[in-house]
């Protein structure tokens, strides 16, 4: 940590480096004195592990599952899924479209799925709210589609004092009437 702090603050002068190293050391000393040591020792893993962001994993999983059409409107934090598809789709034979809004994204994947193409979109809470009429349309026509809701930490763009999976309630009750749906949430 000390080396990282030195590298990060070197251009700001030795006094800034010393202050940051001192604060980090004081925090470490306080924690060591005030808290018990964590009793679990993780075994070393001799095999390197791949690390992916959640949005990358969504894209990779969708491609592995045979998705051949992806349409979306960029909405944080789901935009990374669109970026992943845009960067990798050509090599995988996947058609990608950035459309004018979330309503268009939902309806265009319904059209693609009606032709037998595995189709998907991703959005976040506000975007999914706009898609709910299309959810009902897909149910009425019995056309299977995949809609990913990359949840924010709370209402709107999130609440700084708490986190939740608030979009889950919206997804569970999306559209009108009862129809089969598969909802997966961590």
List each language-model region with its residue ranges.
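Thiamine diphosphate
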Residues: 3-174
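Proteins synthesized as precursors that undergo proteolytic processing into mature forms
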Residues: 180-182
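Glycine-rich ThDP/TPP pyrophosphate-binding loop and its adjacent helix/strand module
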Residues: 185-186
